[in-house]
Amino acid sequence: MENFKHLPEPFRIRVIEPVKRTTREYREKAILNAGMNPFLLDSEDVFIDLLTDSGTGAITQEMQAAMFRGDEAYSGSRSYHALARAVKDIFGYEYTIPTHQGRGAEQIYIPVLIKKREKEKGLDRSKMVALSNYFFDTTQGHTQINCCVAKNVYTEEAFDTGVKADFKGNFDLEKLEQAILEAGPANVPYIVSTITCNSAGGQPVSIANLKAVYEIAQRYDIPVIMDSARFAENAYFIQQRERDYRNWSIEEITREAYKYADGLAMSAKKDAMVQMGGLLCFKDESFFDVYTECRTLCLVQEGFPTYGGLEGGAMERLAVGLYDGMRQDWLAYRINQVEYLVNGLEAIGVICQQAGGHAAFVDAGKLLPHIPADQFPAHALACELYKVAGIRAVEIGSLLLGRDPATGKQHPCPAELLRLTIPRATYTQTHMDFIIEAFEKVKANARNVKGLEFTYEPPVLRHFTARLKEKA
């Protein structure tokens, strides 16, 4: 199938879900009733749902078949052992705890690592600083509710939509080491390597960067956790862009990358393709004590450590999905679909972040320059896009970033982005063309889009349940 301009989807569609078409008047009422927050819309009122790729896509026939192998034993399930074997084979990690999703893993390992630092070093957690190339929102939230500061140390070009670079998700290594020294190494309970870097636009992190981060962390005795939601997409970018790995398979690159962390936390609802599931895993016996404490916390918060909130069939499906998500042809199709959308948007003058792995990120600050950051231009754009075309997208900007817990002031945001997240094997090229046409209509009316203000602001993860109204 070489030398074709566009390759079709590498699958056949066997089951479909009808969606309803709505009028502009209907959608205006719906978004108003939802408090100008797309998260609060009913899914039946959404024509194309680009809110997230987390558990919203299709699954493979092999994953569906695996459900019927499920062992629903409360403890010692053979389905757990199938999952643990897959983790060992793919990542090389010895110890596996299943969780209901990614934040289930976070609510276990984060307090354990912070408490471990307190106990061993006799430190005050309020002085601790956790570091990342960019924390995902729930990872940041769990860090903050455990009284620890979450700090991002990304590269200068990460959020510059005018710059193209192979690995815009990389850590700034100089800033990382500086942040460690400023906080004091003992006050850094963990470093999170987020691959791909969602908040920067699904941008990849190179193996060279992961290795350098791990070397710095080991020098200062700081554990590294890999936020692994999109591990396969990151491996694909490494294969395509990092010279030393161009002839490596996705499986080989994945195994190599995970040498440079001590543990992984995963929302398996992304690259592992399941509707529900997560993982918390540790590499070897050097983290056995942490693993043991995490198992205990899992008992309290998720369930017995050999099911962790998942039924046996779901663990079987996850074990298969980890492999299916690494298929070379599948990843090529998925990355090219995102690139097609980004290229189409830029062709009509809509500025985007460089095409990443799972979504197109529109620079809302440039499309709506008349709306200041504290009136949430990307969220305003999301509301307008829904009104125009029934498309639901999500803000990655000031609304998501939130306030400084100590001062209550809005965190400065490096970019105001609207994320158009593409669920796996769900939408076709025709859908991408419709999205591009919708943006033509939005762009033509951009100057009339209004900023937003709160009518209800939750204290944590406010973007999920906040209610807003248009500024007068």
Curated annotation (Swiss-Prot):
It comes from Vibrio cholerae serotype O1 (strain ATCC 39541 / Classical Ogawa 395 / O395). InterPro entries: ArAA_b-elim_lyase/Thr_aldolase, Beta-eliminating_lyase, PyrdxlP-dep_Trfase, PyrdxlP-dep_Trfase_major, PyrdxlP-dep_Trfase_small, TNase, Tryptophanase_CS. It catalyses: L-tryptophan + H2O = indole + pyruvate + NH4(+). Pathway: Amino-acid degradation; L-tryptophan degradation via pyruvate pathway; indole and pyruvate from L-tryptophan: step 1/1. It comes from the Bacteria. Its EC number is 4.1.99.1. GO terms for molecular function: tryptophanase activity. Belongs to the beta-eliminating lyase family. Its cofactor is pyridoxal 5'-phosphate. Keywords: Lyase, Pyridoxal phosphate, Tryptophan catabolism. SUPFAM superfamilies: PLP-dependent transferases. NCBIfam families: PRK13238.1, tnaA_trp_ase. PANTHER family: BETA-ELIMINATING LYASE-LIKE PROTEIN-RELATED, TRYPTOPHANASE. Homotetramer. This is Tryptophanase. The modification N6-(pyridoxal phosphate)lysine is found at K270. It is an enzyme of class 4 (lyase).
